[in-house]
Amino acid sequence: MPPVVGKKAKKGILERLNAGEIVIGDGGFVFALEKRGYVKAGPWTPEAAVEHPEAVRQLHREFLRAGSNVMQTFTFYASEDKLENRGNYVLEKISGQKVNEAACDIARQVADEGDALVAGGVSQTPSYLSCKSETEVKKVFLQQLEVFMKKNVDFLIAEYFEHVEEAVWAVETLIASGKPVAATMCIGPEGDLHGVPPGECAVRLVKAGASIIGVNCHFDPTISLKTVKLMKEGLEAARLKAHLMSQPLAYHTPDCNKQGFIDLPEFPFGLEPRVATRWDIQKYAREAYNMGIRYIGGCCGFEPYHIRAIAEELAPERGFLPPASEKHGSWGSALDMHTKPWVRARARKEYWENLRIASGRPYNPSMSKPDGWGVTKGTAELMQQKEATTEQQLKELFEKQKFKLQ
């Protein structure tokens, strides 16, 4: 598509990264919109792009104002098999095409309000978990890709994959578009759910055609950066090159196992005590930058103020602050205007950097014991279905959970 007359053409994602620029991603949509009443926890599907476009648009705008350079289409779990999984009505009543098209239109509208790019995103599928063939799974990705091509997104992201095999299938499908492809996996230092180490995952993704690789979701910034470091080492050992990307959770997960925060008993409705502070995220941004990561964003739990923290921490390198910083004093400096003297005394970096945050929950533990069911692709409980989950199926799961808790 030719550039609009009178409008300066935006630099592409690889042009920016190849020049050493910092690209700031956006934050988490499904969790943020679930809290606001627009997404249903459980299926986590993005029909809000059609049903409540104003809510999706506003969240995009807040991330843009906070400093995001990329507007990811709100197409997480927007594959047709997911939109009809376990009794979901979206495919039948709305259609996958309408959801994906609406998400693209909203992202483009907001991206063009600033210097942001639009990334069309696909994620893991019920088809893969149910042991469908490579051809069948790739067909699911292709349905979304056709919409992304029609809407002329700037680049593509294959994100949130627990198995590198499926992530590779996604990259191989997306790369046929001729557009740059990024690929992120929701894995920790132990690797994917089939035991493939992070370094090998990175090598496979790059060989499949990804220009940008890394992690997203499931783990906190500290664990995620350890995983990206292993990916980087894997690429170096294989003499392969790719740009690095990190979009972790905004929840602290030191007690997670291989499955990440989904295994925590608090998932998804009791995670608030684990939320990272803006100062935690500034530390994450600096560590990511020092590691050589240049695409830095967030996933579930990341609100616009977290993205602003990334933009503020890296402002010296980028040369500017985001618009949202107009109402935010650096390291709490605006607290010098507070009426209470002890709060004015907190208007300094040293205070917030060294504060040990209390939870306010005196009888609660600091750590949890993950559920650890150990299920992965091919396990009976992970086989997906079009019909709603039955009472008998739930009863069996409740009994299994009781046994695990004993």
UniProtKB/Swiss-Prot annotation:
Keyword Transmembrane: no
Catalysed conversion reaction: L-homocysteine + glycine betaine = N,N-dimethylglycine + L-methionine
Subunit structure: Homotetramer.
Record's cofactor remark: Binds 1 zinc ion per subunit.
The Hcy-binding domain, residue ranges: 11-314
Function description: Involved in the regulation of homocysteine metabolism. Converts betaine and homocysteine to dimethylglycine and methionine, respectively. This reaction is also required for the irreversible oxidation of choline.
Molecular function via GO: betaine-homocysteine S-methyltransferase activity; zinc ion binding
UniProt binding sites for Zn(2+): 217, 299-300
Pathway listed: Amine and polyamine degradation; betaine degradation; sarcosine from betaine: step 1/2; Amino-acid biosynthesis; L-methionine biosynthesis via de novo pathway; L-methionine from L-homocysteine (BhmT route): step 1/1
Keywords, alphabetical: Cytoplasm, Metal-binding, Methyltransferase, Nucleus, Phosphoprotein, Transferase, Zinc
Keyword Membrane belongs to the record: no
Highest taxon, organism lineage: Eukaryota
Protein name per Swiss-Prot or TrEMBL: Betaine--homocysteine S-methyltransferase 1
Modification N6-succinyllysine occurs at: 40, 93, 98, 232, 241, 340, 377
One of the GO BP terms on file: 'de novo' L-methionine biosynthetic process
Modified residues (Phosphoserine): 330
